[in-house]
């Protein structure tokens, strides 16, 4: 399939290209900044000290290689609503069916988890309001938003992303001011030497260092969401190329910058593992409502993740209905006048609507934590299959050497595959992750066998 044919496919798309360059740039930024940075940075620092910076750089490099691979395939054919469509194209209908349904269910569980988190964050201000009511209200609101032209989704994500950026830049600027004023925290003077003083690469042992890889890996989950926006992006090729190329500097600025800021203000051993460093530091400079401020930031972060999940699941469901000739999926091919696969969106919202029931029943809620952990592990399976698909693409007639090609792909792709495999294997080495890891393997085996023996009807 050549570039001219793909350009014709772009014009024939029933969706509307309402996402502009600034939307995609902020979506890319928001995708690299998870809620975990605001709430979990203290725990990850406590686990392995300043060497956590190297862990973030390594995982960031793996994710950048993945996104360059996705970006190259989408650059060649930006008419695709989901980067997972390439699995069906280059690896076959059955692997495509397996990975798209797996990813769809994974993101449904992630969306449910984010909705539960939103209810909890709002409960911080409205403790007397039942959480289930909050969850239903937010879900209905975001569903209505997603029925509009994609530009409204882009605009919402733009401002959600801006809030996270302002919070991180505020933290970094605070650290710079405190460093130059030689501020004393009560235990020590704010200085970059707090990071290097008594530096040990493995302060809590090698096992803690490798355990931190899992935490950091799941902080980066959902960065691949940008691969769902190509078909609805105005002028997608240069826009996606620019957004993906800027990811490394964003990782350095927002993640590494925030970690350096936190560890320069407090010696890392003094940073509480169970409290947000953002709250601690903003309280230090006299912001009494620091807890409320950070709660607002993580609320918008969770709302952004849920909003993106609705968009992602809807487009994946539409893509499945396009690729497979199952009658049960046909209703999901319908687009509204606003250019939205509306039936797929409503079905997605109905699935997520089970969340309030999960919140209200403790036995189910406890089981759901396990299911969500299993689902999150499956992201690694998705990433691995995407990279293998990319290798198939490079050997196909569709490969465009003049496109957005990944330099030295023959070196970087095997390295990324090895990295993700090692992280997945490490899940079996720690008591907190071994059971969910076994659960994810069981899913791969059972659903994989089901897919293997099932007759997949592909659409023409």
Curated annotation (Swiss-Prot):
Signal sequence coordinates: none
Q: What is its main location?
A: membrane
Free-text disruption phenotype from the record: Deletion mutant is only marginally affected in medium that contains only free amino acids as a source of amino acids. Mutant shows almost no change in serine and L-threonine uptake, but shows a strong decrease in L-alanine uptake. SerP1/serP2 double mutant is completely devoid of uptake activity of either L-serine, L-threonine or L-alanine.
What's an example GO cellular component term for this entry? plasma membrane
Disulfide linkages recorded for this protein, renumbered to the chain, are none
Spans traversing the lipid bilayer: 26-46, 47-67, 98-118, 124-144, 160-180, 209-229, 246-266, 278-298, 344-364, 368-388, 410-430, 433-453
Any idea which UniProt keywords this protein has?
Amino-acid transport, Cell membrane, Membrane, Transmembrane, Transmembrane helix, Transport
Decide whether keyword Mitochondrion is in the record. Answer: no
Q: How does it sit in the membrane?
A: Multi-pass membrane protein
Q: What does this protein do?
A: Transports DL-alanine, DL-serine and glycine. The preferred substrate is DL-alanine. L-serine is a low-affinity substrate.
What is the name listed in the Swiss-Prot or TrEMBL entry for this protein?
Answer: DL-alanine permease SerP2
Q: Which gene encodes it?
A: serP2
